[in-house]
Amino acid sequence: MVNWFRRRKKRVVVPRLHTRGETPAAVNKVDLAELTPTLEPYLAQAAYLQLTIFETLSSALVTAPSTESKEAVSRAASFSLAKHHGLVAELARKGVDAAEAMKPYAARIDDYRRRTLGANWHETMVTAYVTAGLLDDFYRTLASGLPAEPARRIAEVLDTEDGHELIMGELKRAIENDPKLASKLAMWGRRLVGDTLLIARSALAMPADGHSEEARLEPVFTELVAAHTRRMDALGLTA
């Protein structure tokens, strides 16, 4: 059974997240390559999202509790900024002004960032950990529908160091020092998944009548959530 989130006027769809041990009904999984946007909108959205992750980590840097934490967060932020620059370089190859290309998506993505930033340093760090992981996985998979040569270069950009280990180390230390954080951060992580899948889905080049694709998208997003669950497990948190 598929349960979709709906927004008034504009229908936005995210697959239901299955609980552990639950087996979804068999469906014909869509190949994301069929729904990949053309190169310019792909790059513009991916680049702006990397910039957003950098902004999130920059916010965490300001309130980091120690010099060691500031150093770790700054390094993680630099990796996201490097990915942003790598994707912007691909736009430049096409003679496209990156700032202009990103403008149509900025308001929607900025709203997503505001809703997922977190109320404190620990939540902001979980936001960076969860959203960067999910979005990198999504855009890496989506790149398979791009022309071969730019797809290869984009994969190289997205496969570079991501800072997850640095963020995970900081969060593990925080949870060890205050075990009560675990349940709060696990809950926050679960809240982030829906919003992040919505922003990912908005990048897809859906047909005018995309209703037939919705059920076929569920296994794709279920795979993304499975990878997210493994990352949360690595933190000792329940996804």
Mark where each language-model region is.
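Acidic/His metal-coordination segments adjacent to aromatic residues that form catalytic metal sites
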Residues: P24-A44, Y105-A128
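Alpha-helical scaffold segments that form or flank carboxylate-/histidine-based iron centers
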Residues: T38-L43, E68-A82, T124, E149-G163
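Short, extreme N-terminal leader segments that mark the start of a protein/domain
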Residues: M1-S69, V73
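Extended, helix-rich structural scaffolds rather than catalytic motifs
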Residues: L181-A239
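Charged, well-structured binding/catalytic surfaces in domain cores that contact anionic ligands
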Residues: A143-P179, S183
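Conserved alpha-helical segments that form or flank metal/cofactor-binding pockets of metalloenzymes
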Residues: N3-R11, A76-K103
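Acidic/histidine-rich alpha-helical segments that form the ligand environment
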Residues: Y42-A46, Q50-I53, L57, R114-D159, ...
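A structural signal for well-ordered alpha-helices, especially hydrophobic packing surfaces
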Residues: F54, H84, V88-L91, D136-Y139, ...
